[in-house]
From Swiss-Prot:
Residues 9-239 form the ABC transporter domain. One of its GO terms (cellular component) is plasma membrane. Pfam families: ABC_tran. It comes from Shewanella frigidimarina (strain NCIMB 400). InterPro entries: AAA+_ATPase, ABC_transporter-like_ATP-bd, ABC_transporter-like_CS, ABC_transpr_LolD-like, LolD_lipo_ATP-bd, MacB-like_ATP-bd, P-loop_NTPase. Part of the ABC transporter complex LolCDE involved in the translocation of mature outer membrane-directed lipoproteins, from the inner membrane to the periplasmic chaperone, LolA. Responsible for the formation of the LolA-lipoprotein complex in an ATP-dependent manner. Belongs to the ABC transporter superfamily. Lipoprotein translocase (TC 3.A.1.125) family. One of its GO terms (molecular function) is ATP hydrolysis activity. This is Lipoprotein-releasing system ATP-binding protein LolD. Keywords: ATP-binding, Cell inner membrane, Cell membrane, Membrane, Nucleotide-binding, Translocase, Transport.
């Protein structure tokens, strides 16, 4: 990243707590973070540190108790639920530890599904899905359902699905957590290459310090507070 790198997503003073009767649990505490266009950012931390909650808030899958989240300057939590859903479909991609592929659909259909939901031409969506699957090395597995794919192959399908609508930002929650070391390395290589090819930003929540160390920036989450671990850019700092 360069000094002129443009901000894509800004998390401003975000806090999150839950109430259970008279007990209040603070999950996030005044988090500030800028994600830049095209960068790869890792957030590491122990279970329960708040990193997945932060990722969900960034993706409008959970609501902050306080604070602001801006995507290209648009305040996500001042929008209607319909507009939020549109942003999730068009501007955001999601990858999870457990791929969440639809079991009755083939690999190509799973990848094309977000494009179908967007209302794109079905024939073109399938062409785009085929191209992405070929890009991640699965051109020979287009018509296989998830049960016929290995764990690494299913995760590659999930990565292709996350990219089908050419999102500005992909949010990945433990994308290598269910894979062996070799498959995990392959997933990272694909993230890096696809980020460079499409200019997509990636935020990856992970326990995998080896994976995190390869990203442009590495932050750690502890007790709901973000801290800088490493950055390859002079702009790569949490505010």
């Amino acid at each position: 990243m360069s000094q002129t790198q443009q901000a894509l997503l800004q998390v401003q003073h975000v806090s999150k707590h839950y109430h259970d009767g008279e007990v209040t649990t603070q999950v996030l505490s005044g988090v500030d973070l800028t994600v830049y266009k095209g960068e790869q950012l890792a957030i590491v931390g122990s279970s329960g540190s708040g990193k997945s909650t932060l990722l969900h808030i960034m993706g409008t899958l959970d609501t902050p108790t306080s604070g602001t989240v801006l995507l290209d300057g648009e305040d996500l939590y001042q929008l209607s639920s319909a507009r939020q859903a549109q942003i999730r479909n068009q501007d955001l991609g999601f990858i999870y530890q457990f791929h969440h592929l639809l079991p009755e659909f083939t690999a190509i259909e799973n990848v094309a599904m977000p494009a179908f939901i967007q209302g794109r031409d079905k024939t073109q969506a399938l062409v785009d899905a085929k191209n992405l699957l070929e890009r991640v090395g699965l051109g020979h597995r287009l018509q296989h359902i998830p049960a016929q794919l290995s764990g690494g192959e299913r995760q590659r399908v999930a990565i292709a699905r996350a990219l089908i609508n050419k999102p500005k930002l992909v949010l990945a929650d433990e994308p290598t957590g269910n894979l062996d070391a070799s498959s995990g390395d392959n997933v990272y290589a694909m993230i890096r290459e696809l980020a460079q090819q499409f200019g997509t930003a990636f935020v990856v929540v992970t326990h995998d310090h080896k994976l995190a160390a390869k990203m442009d920036r590495q932050l750690t989450m502890k007790d709901g507070i973000l801290q800088v671990v490493a950055a390859t850019s002079p702009t790569g700092l949490a505010e």
